[in-house]
From Swiss-Prot:
Family per similarity comment: Belongs to the CinA family.
Name by which UniProt lists this protein: Putative competence-damage inducible protein
Superkingdom classification of source: Bacteria
UniProt xrefs under PANTHER family: NICOTINAMIDE-NUCLEOTIDE AMIDOHYDROLASE PNCC, NMN AMIDOHYDROLASE-LIKE PROTEIN YFAY
InterPro entries assigned to the protein according to its UniProt record, in alphabetical order: CinA, CinA-like_C, CinA_C, CinA_KH, Competence-induced_CinA, MoaB/Mog-like_dom_sf, MoaB/Mog_dom
Gene3D superfamilies in alphabetical order: 3.30.70.2860, CinA-like, MoaB/Mog-like domain
Length: 412
């Protein structure tokens, strides 16, 4: 079954709020085998909403509306759909009692426009609103399914989970949707796609969807099957084919983000970490401390932005700073080794470079050096040539730090 999500609200068109409902619904619908091919946003306008309904009816089996169920004059979703379908609106007694009780308890006047929230399409399945007043509803008519949901996410999401999804399962084939996200770093989206292009071109079940984000690339593998175990087998087969080709860049699944994976490995190895940050200015250390219980492996860090701190706190030789410069392989090496010694850690990692927008020390923005000093191992320095805004260069540098730390920890 194919669905279209129609979000109603002028505030969405003006960019005053984000349409998070569509993201939530798309993910939930996919998990029960309902395809979402279109998202539509329309303002609080009867004529344009009617046009959106007519277009959606031509290309979708299910129309899911969010918003426009409230008490004000511009809340017109129910009225427009009722007119389109030739259905009347009737009061739902449970919703009316709930709204009436609320106004009695709060001592407020129960006006006619507030009663409007209890109106539902005649013959519809009514979905209780446990976190608000306006109920949702579902109606199967003329070979189409119409779902009306409140706009506020705090009302819509629990309503969907408790009442709407069980209702929608009556219209699905019973196939289970199983997805797995493979996470890669150190390879661009175009490079990765070239290596697995034949698999993408030949995809049927499972499907392969690449996505690039902040220097990472993910591949979402999605399989459909009535048996979840069989769906997992379909995905595992394709995953094995992918990792045969680009496994060296793979680091985790789903929500296993790079910095969490690196910290997990530190804990597993029983090693401690210290950082010296010039370019990144604390970004790396901040991400380290997002992990619970990280005090067992993270000694701390030094933000050595000024050369005085590099020289007098982390003992980078003056001749290195004056000859090679603060943005250099030698400086990164000294910073990593000396912060390790200063904070008595097993591993020291350092970041120095040019974030931009201007050049520094005759080096272009994006020139970055990441140093990694591990006890009983030779110190290594990774030169990077990054692009992007000042903030993007800093964030990507920190991410490369986690990547090289993770890969090095895998080796030892």
């Amino acid at each position: 079954m194919n669905a279209e999500i129609i979000a109603v609200g002028t505030e969405l068109l003006l960019g005053q709020i984000a349409n998070t409902n569509a993201q939530f619904l798309s993910e939930k619908l996919a998990s029960i085998g309902i395809n979402v091919y279109y998202h539509t946003v329309v303002g609080d306008n009867n004529k344009r909403l009617q046009q959106a309904i007519e277009v959606a009816e031509e290309r979708a089996d299910m129309l899911i509306f969010t918003g426009g169920l409230g008490p004000t004059k511009d809340d017109l979703t129910k009225e427009t759909i009722a007119s389109s379908l030739g259905e009347e609106l009737v009061y739902d007694e449970n919703a009316l009692a709930l709204i009436s009780d609320y106004f009695k308890r709060t001592g407020r006047e129960f006006t006619e426009n507030n009663k409007k929230q209890a109106l539902v399409l005649n013959g519809a399945n009514v979905f209780a609103n446990d976190h608000g007043m306006a109920p949702g509803m579902g109606l199967n008519k003329n070979g189409k399914v119409y779902i009306l949901l409140p706009g506020p996410p705090k009302e819509m999401k629990p309503m969907y989970v408790s009442y709407v999804e069980p209702f929608l399962r009556n219209f699905t084939t019973g196939e289970n949707i199983y997805s797995r996200v493979l996470r890669f770093f150190g390879i661009g989206e175009s490079q990765l796609e070239v290596k697995v292009q034949d698999l993408i071109d030949g995809q049927t079940n499972p499907t392969i969807a690449p996505l690039a984000n902040d220097g990472e690339v993910t591949l979402r593998l999605t399989a459909k099957h009535q048996n979840v175990d069989e769906a997992e087998k379909l995905i595992q087969h394709v995953e094995d084919l992918i990792l045969e080709r680009v496994g060296e860049f793979f680091y985790g699944y789903d929500q296993e983000f790079l910095h969490y994976k690196a910290i997990e490995l530190l804990k597993k190895k029983g090693l401690t970490l210290a950082c010296a940050e010039s370019l990144t200015g604390g970004l790396f250390g901040n991400q380290v401390t997002e992990s619970a219980g990280v005090s067992s492996v993270f000694k701390g860090g030094v933000i050595c932005y000024h050369n005085d701190v590099k020289q007098h706190v982390l003992h980078v030789p003056e001749e290195v700073l004056s000859t090679d410069g603060a943005v250099s392989k030698e400086c990164a090496r000294y910073l990593a080794e000396n912060v390790k010694e200063l904070l008595k850690a097993d591993i020291g990692i350092s970041f120095t470079g040019v974030a931009g927008p201007d050049a520094s020390e005759h080096k272009e923005p994006g020139t970055v050096f990441v140093g990694l000093a591990i006890k009983d191992e030779p110190t290594v320095v990774f030169p990077l040539n990054l692009s992007g805004s000042r903030q993007q260069i800093r964030e990507r540098s920190a991410k490369y730090g986690f990547y090289h730390l993770y890969k090095k920890l895998e080796e030892i």
